[in-house]
Swiss-Prot record:
Protein known as: Large ribosomal subunit protein uL5
Protein source organism: Campylobacter lari (strain RM2100 / D67 / ATCC BAA-1060)
Gene Ontology molecular functions: rRNA binding; structural constituent of ribosome; tRNA binding
Function: This is one of the proteins that bind and probably mediate the attachment of the 5S RNA into the large ribosomal subunit, where it forms part of the central protuberance. In the 70S ribosome it contacts protein S13 of the 30S subunit (bridge B1b), connecting the 2 subunits; this bridge is implicated in subunit movement. Contacts the P site tRNA; the 5S rRNA and some of its associated proteins might help stabilize positioning of ribosome-bound tRNAs.
UniProt subunit comment: Part of the 50S ribosomal subunit; part of the 5S rRNA/L5/L18/L25 subcomplex. Contacts the 5S rRNA and the P site tRNA. Forms a bridge to the 30S subunit in the 70S ribosome.
Cross-referenced SUPFAM superfamilies: RL5-like (SSF55282)
HAMAP family registered for this protein in UniProt: Ribosomal_uL5_B
InterPro entries on file: Ribosomal_uL5, Ribosomal_uL5_bac-type, Ribosomal_uL5_C, Ribosomal_uL5_CS, Ribosomal_uL5_dom_sf, Ribosomal_uL5_N
Family: Belongs to the universal ribosomal protein uL5 family.
Gene Ontology annotations of biological process type: translation
Ribonucleoprotein keyword on record: yes
């Protein structure tokens, strides 16, 4: 059993029930999925670089990443329908807990001058979004094999009804938020 999954069932669930006075056990908030995405932009023009980005995200996530394609042509961005525009992977269950554990305990502490994740990344529906500037903080990524550094967006989707519930859930998981607010 995953460390964070065990922590959720033994410690976090009872704490959430107590804090938010939840009567129905099916209403206890949990993390549904984690989506990691990279908008390739200029990188999408070079197929080799885009494949390298997909391989890197696959290494980080522990699951095969998918190259996303444009749904519509947009002349202003010089994008045609069907052109590759990014890379994404959706993590659920054990892969999700493994990634979150790695992110919280290994990757985020390696970020230079890290003061916590911003609290304004909540969307009003209990989901949290934040971005990372580069992929080199993850231990699986080898600097020599990277063609270009790139950032990534990480979305943590929860079943929480409010931002307050979602923030408490993530804090109990050990997500380091910035001080203030």
């Amino acid at each position: 059993m995953m460390r964070l999954k065990e922590k959720y069932t033994q410690n976090i669930k009872p704490a959430l029930v107590k804090e938010f006075d939840i009567k129905n056990p099916m209403l206890i908030p949990f993390i549904e999925k984690v989506v990691i995405s990279v908008g390739a932009g200029e990188l999408a023009k070079d197929q080799k670089v885009l494949q390298n980005v997909a391989d890197t995200i696959s290494l980080i996530a522990g699951q095969k990443a998918v190259i996303t394609k444009a749904k519509k042509s947009v002349a202003g961005f010089k994008v045609r329908e069907g052109f590759p525009v990014g890379v994404m992977v959706t993590l659920r269950k054990d892969n999700m807990y493994a990634f979150l554990d790695k992110l919280i305990t290994i990757a985020l502490p390696r970020v230079k001058d890290f003061r916590g994740l911003p609290r304004d990344g909540f969307d009003g529906r209990g989901n949290y979004n934040f971005g990372l500037d580069e992929q080199l903080m993850f231990p699986e990524v080898e600097y020599d094999k990277i063609l270009r550094t790139h950032g990534m967006n990480i979305s943590i989707v929860t079943t929480a009804k409010s931002d307050k519930e979602a923030q408490k859930l993530l804090e109990l998981f050990g997500v380091p938020f910035a001080k203030g607010k």
